[in-house]
Amino acid sequence: MKNKVKELRARFGYSQEKLGETVGVTRQTVAAIEKGDYVPSLLLALKICKAFSMKMEDVFWLEEEN
């Protein structure tokens, strides 16, 4: 799964720690999501989208398989 979390976080002026506090996870979890090492639960993805006032499909999308 791909995402724009890092890009949006920078645009909104959030640190990884601040976004983590906002959505209820650690800074390390935010970093892992940004790197694509961790796929968030639906609830967490919705919280992240709400923090940025964006729709799910504008933040997260499936990577096309070859």
From Swiss-Prot:
InterPro entries: Cro/C1-type_HTH, Lambda_DNA-bd_dom_sf. Gene3D superfamilies: lambda repressor-like DNA-binding domains. One of its GO terms (molecular function) is DNA binding. Residues 5-59 form the HTH cro/C1-type domain. Pfam families: HTH_3 (PF01381). Residues 16-35 bind DNA. Keywords: DNA-binding, Transcription, Transcription regulation. This is Uncharacterized HTH-type transcriptional regulator YgzD. The gene is ygzD.
